[in-house]
UniProtKB/Swiss-Prot annotation:
Cofactor: Mo-molybdopterin
Protein name: Mitochondrial amidoxime reducing component 2
EC supergroup of this enzyme: oxidoreductase
Enzyme Commission number(s) of this protein: 1.7.-.-
Residue(s) of cross-link: Glycyl lysine isopeptide (Lys-Gly) (interchain with G-Cter in ubiquitin): K10, K31
Source organism of this protein record: Sus scrofa (Pig)
Gene Ontology molecular functions: oxidoreductase activity
Locations listed in the record: Peroxisome; Mitochondrion outer membrane
Catalytic activity: N(omega)-hydroxy-L-arginine + 2 Fe(II)-[cytochrome b5] + 2 H(+) = L-arginine + 2 Fe(III)-[cytochrome b5] + H2O
GO cellular component: mitochondrial outer membrane; peroxisome
Name of the coding gene: MTARC2
Co-factor binding details: Binds 1 Mo-molybdopterin (Mo-MPT) cofactor per subunit.
Role played: Catalyzes the reduction of N-oxygenated molecules, acting as a counterpart of cytochrome P450 and flavin-containing monooxygenases in metabolic cycles. As a component of prodrug-converting system, reduces a multitude of N-hydroxylated prodrugs particularly amidoximes, leading to increased drug bioavailability. May be involved in mitochondrial N(omega)-hydroxy-L-arginine (NOHA) reduction, regulating endogenous nitric oxide levels and biosynthesis.
């Protein structure tokens, strides 16, 4: 799973979700964060 921080989501291949990834643990936190492209 590749996650890229972005400002907006305009690509149909991706779904925009509000999430962050803890850089130390790699744990995804869906409750807080910046918009990202996430492969679905």
């Amino acid at each position: 799973l590749w996650i890229y921080p972005v400002k907006s989501c305009k690509t149909e291949a991706y779904r925009c979700i509000l999430t962050t990834v803890d850089p130390d643990t790699g744990v995804i936190d869906r409750k807080v964060g910046d918009p990202v492209y996430r492969m679905v």
